[in-house]
Amino acid sequence: MFFTFAAKIVSMEIINKYFGELTEQQLEQFSKLQELYKDWNLKINVVSRKDIDELYLRHVLHSLGIAKVMEFKAGAQVMDVGTGGGFPGIPLAILFPETNFHLVDSIGKKIKVVNEVVAGLGIENVKTTHGRVEEVKETYDFIVSRAVAQMETFHRWVKNKVHKKQNHELKNGILYLKGGDLTEELANFPKATIYDLPNYFEEDFFETKKVVHLPMKYKG
């Protein structure tokens, strides 16, 4: 019991280390994540069991890498494609409570866990869909994801799903968490910008981690 509590405190410290102006509600919501995921992961495996004790580093803080590149505005519409257990969508929804997040996954049991975590946290700015992204009819300011496919494939899935109106410093498009050498993968995307996460986070885990921003033209 003591170990679990201590681990949670240490884990929360890594969030506070890089995001020091959280509200009491945000602190409470972030602090609940490990317990919620640990409980649901015993029933439905959505996070690697070896990662569950490092949830805040490998999943929560990694998801929040997008927030170091983009501060979503109130009322913005963001879709998380292939959200899995809710990453990066849920941590971003906690950090940006006035931004609307749509979490999509084709695997029903994963969306079930996401729905339960969202309910457990009392988050009101998240909606979910069990289905394929190609079936989604809405458009968004940004589409986020965590390496669910090669960029060529991912771009094809979401190319018609961005708003025309621009409201942010970065142009509407994809914000993609990726890792490793992306030279070949991004060869056909000269407008892509790579943000290296070691510039924001000092932990070894982020050594090769990146956020890729790919602006996309509106196609009505």
Regions found by a protein language model. Give the residues of each.
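Conserved beta-strand signature within the Rossmann-like core of class I S-adenosyl-L-methionine
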Residues: 167-181
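Active-site capping/gating segments
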Residues: 181-220
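Short glycine-rich anion-binding loops that position phosphate/pyrophosphate groups of nucleotides
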Residues: 147-150, 182
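Conserved SAM-binding loop and adjacent beta-strand
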Residues: 29, 47-67
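A short glycine-rich, Lys/Arg-flanked "PGG" loop and its adjoining helix->strand segment in the class I
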Residues: 155-171
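N-terminal auxiliary segments of SAM/dcSAM-dependent transferases
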Residues: 1-45
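Conserved SAM/SAH cofactor-binding pocket of Class I
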Residues: 64-145, 155
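Conserved hydrophobic residues forming the short capping helix/wall of the S-adenosyl-L-methionine
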Residues: 41, 117-118, 162
